[in-house]
Amino acid sequence: IEETDYTKDGSVKSVHKYKLNSEGDVIEETEYDGANKLKEKKEVKYNSLGEKSEEVIYGSDLKVTKKHVFSYNNQGLKTEKKTYDAVNKLISSKKYIYSYQ
């Protein structure tokens, strides 16, 4: 799948290319600028239940810039998102809490 964004004058602003797995989930997203130079690449992994478990983000040099790791509860609700830097050091952790009425 390919998606192109244009500026007001009609020139190409950016191009996003997507690769999907057999379930239709995005497993790779690549973004190029208007000159067709790589800006960013994302690779996504899913667990056995089809939930996004990991997202690795690469810069224009194809070196890892950050990684997100996701956790879920037994109901399939996201419970945590951990973000790591280029050297795999934890830089943030976000917990999700759900309340039911």
PLM regions with names:
Residues I1-Q101:
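Buried hydrophobic residues that stabilize the cores of well-folded domains
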